[in-house]
Amino acid sequence: EILACTTLGLEHHKTVKWIIEVAALNAKQIIQLSALIKNLVISNFKEEHYASVFVKSSTGFYKTKNNLPNGATRETIILMLENASPLPVKAAGGVRTLEEAIAMIRLGVKKIGTSSAKSIANNALSQSDY
């Protein structure tokens, strides 16, 4: 399914984002899924297409026990970057401040998914629970 859906997206000149919902996974599973997506893309597509296939950390909707972070934590993003490269990583879920956004960019993410863009741009604290 990963191969078929990636092919369909790329054939239509779209960006493909594979959401692995890291809050539902352990470190080993994050590594395995990131590597699986990377290996399928590298084995089946030209290097020029790599930049159009993202591995994304979260939808932002996954409910965790005890309100633990549900997406882009430093630890999960590092695992994704180390195992998805050369595919780009999109940090999503829980990036709510300018400091968090800068930290993700410094780690190497290529995109950030956030409902707090205005607050981040204004360097203000987000009021969003989304």
Give residue spans per PLM region.
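Conserved anion-binding
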Residues: 1-64
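Amphipathic, non-transmembrane alpha-helical secondary structure
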Residues: 3, 7, 31-35, 74, ...
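N-terminal small/glycine-rich loop or linker at the start of catalytic domains
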Residues: 14-17, 72-85
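Conserved hydrophobic beta-strand within the GNAT/NAT acetyltransferase core sheet
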Residues: 18, 89-93
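Short, exposed beta-strand "edge-strand" segments with a Pro/Gly-rich flavor and a Y/T-containing core
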Residues: 24, 68-72, 96
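Catalytic cores of alpha/beta
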Residues: 25-36, 79-86, 95-111
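Glycine-rich phosphate-binding active-site loops on the catalytic face of alpha/beta enzymes
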Residues: 43-67, 93-130
